[in-house]
């Protein structure tokens, strides 16, 4: 009787192993360069991301640290993740977590999503929003978080042929990234990326309505697939170029 029970247990374990789906994991590294007067491009940050997929669910973690090559650039360390599912070349985020740390200060930002829509927002400690334009509830619910945005623009299957607008909310600011005008060659696929401030900025910045235009670039790899190469974004009046290592 004990032998029969043992055999049943062994068969059950083997069946579970055979039918379990192994996680697919990928780690990517990026360098962030700032365009500085007189100095040109200077590496100011390192980014590491890790993607783990089981069936259609995923976890995507994100870590940013300064290089300390220049003393005056942002010295914050940022870490976080998103959880969600991947379906039909689309990213459906369920949870977002981000922590920023600098010296003895830290801030945690969390979003929970329902049906791929931001439902709850927690920012601790809160930002001082007394001098910036209001971000409405509708503006928030139509958006995604910055890590989801980065995951999308660095993976070719999620850019929808360079014909989409990614609406982003980071817990304070609301902005649009519009992808358009694909330029296709034998070796590359380049989208025009238009960055526009929507809300959560000083009123004069919104009134100025200054639009930043750059390129989102993918290169053809040895398997003839498009892989992210680089993108230029605007942050605090500084041009930042993110390049895949």
Where are each of the predicted segments found?
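Hydrophobic h-region of N-terminal signal peptides that target proteins for export
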Residues: 12-20
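Bacterial N-terminal signal peptides that target proteins for export
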Residues: 1-8
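Acidic, serine/threonine-rich low-complexity disordered tracts
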Residues: 24-113, 156-245
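Short, structured interface segments that constitute the first stable element of a domain
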Residues: 131-174
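Hydrophobic, well-structured mid-protein blocks that either form specific transmembrane helices
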Residues: 106-148
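Intrinsic disorder/low-complexity signature
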Residues: 4, 16, 140-142, 152, ...
């Amino acid at each position: 009787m004990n032998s029969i029970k043992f055999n049943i247990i062994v068969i059950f374990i083997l069946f579970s192993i055979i039918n379990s789906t192994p996680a697919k994991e990928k780690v990517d590294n990026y360098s962030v360069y700032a365009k500085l007067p007189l100095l040109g491009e200077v590496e100011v940050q390192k980014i590491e991301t890790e993607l783990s997929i089981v069936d259609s669910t995923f976890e995507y973690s994100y870590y940013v640290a300064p290089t300390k090559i220049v003393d005056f650039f942002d010295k914050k360390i940022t870490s976080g993740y998103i959880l969600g599912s991947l379906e039909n070349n689309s990213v459906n985020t369920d949870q977002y977590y981000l922590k920023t740390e600098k010296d003895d200060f830290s801030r945690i930002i969390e979003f929970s999503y329902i049906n791929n829509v931001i439902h709850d927002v927690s920012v601790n400690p809160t930002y001082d929003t007394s001098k910036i334009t209001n971000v409405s509830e509708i503006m928030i619910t139509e958006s995604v978080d910055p890590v989801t945005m980065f995951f999308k623009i660095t993976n070719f299957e999620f850019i929808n042929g360079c014909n989409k607008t990614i609406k982003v909310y980071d817990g304070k600011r609301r902005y649009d990234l519009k992808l358009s005008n694909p330029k296709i060659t034998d070796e590359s696929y380049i989208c025009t990326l238009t960055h526009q401030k929507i809300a959560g900025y000083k009123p004069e910045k919104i009134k100025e309505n200054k639009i930043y235009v750059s390129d989102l670039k993918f290169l053809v790899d040895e398997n003839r697939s498009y892989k992210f190469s680089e993108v230029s974004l605007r942050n605090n009046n500084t041009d930042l170029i993110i390049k895949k290592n």
